[in-house]
């Protein structure tokens, strides 16, 4: 209650925070508590593709909600082509559409870009500024980083904090 945000974003609920909470449902409820601290005119930014999106909408009431996602209807969505060199994305928002190229690999990074775009829109940032910011992003060392191999091969280095979930995300 010390800082009352104007924008609160939940990307997802998963197994990463099970310690002390016991279940993914408990993680989702705990994450949803952030919405109770929003300013009266604050905006909740919610992943429409997450199984707990409905719960978060309920917890965010009476605040305005802005959703993002690729697989379910959302306020901020994308059409994209994924490639080994990055993603070509058409960002669709309530303010209009804009094309961009992301150097980050994988659908999960497109979802991260949608989350960032949603929070930025909620904060009043213009679409062109969102595009410029997202296009500047570069992969961290060991996070879906393309490295040259022998005979023209490419190696996908995802060794930083690798786990089964990150492996699946890398394959996608």
Where are each of the predicted segments found?
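Amphipathic, non-transmembrane alpha-helical secondary structure
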Residues: 1, 32, 36, 168-172
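Acidic, Mg2+-coordinating active-site environments of NTP-dependent enzymes
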Residues: 4-154
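AMP-binding/adenylate-forming catalytic core of the ANL superfamily
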Residues: 27, 161-172
């Amino acid at each position: 209650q010390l800082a009352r945000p104007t924008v609160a974003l939940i990307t997802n609920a998963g197994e990463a925070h099970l310690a002390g909470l016991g279940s993914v449902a408990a993680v989702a409820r705990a994450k949803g508590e952030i919405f109770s601290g929003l300013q009266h005119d604050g905006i909740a930014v919610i992943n429409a593709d997450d199984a707990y999106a409905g719960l978060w909408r309920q917890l965010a009431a009476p605040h305005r909600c802005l959703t993002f996602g690729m697989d379910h209807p959302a306020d901020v969505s994308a059409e994209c082509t994924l490639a080994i060199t990055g993603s070509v994305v058409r960002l669709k928002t309530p303010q209009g559409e804009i094309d961009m190229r992301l150097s980050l690999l994988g659908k999960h990074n497109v979802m991260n870009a949608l989350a960032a775009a949603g929070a930025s829109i909620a904060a009043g940032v213009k679409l062109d500024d969102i595009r410029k910011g997202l296009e500047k992003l570069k992969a961290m060392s060991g996070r879906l980083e393309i490295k040259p191999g022998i005979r023209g091969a490419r190696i996908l280095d995802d060794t930083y904090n690798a786990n089964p979930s990150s492996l699946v995300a890398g394959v996608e």
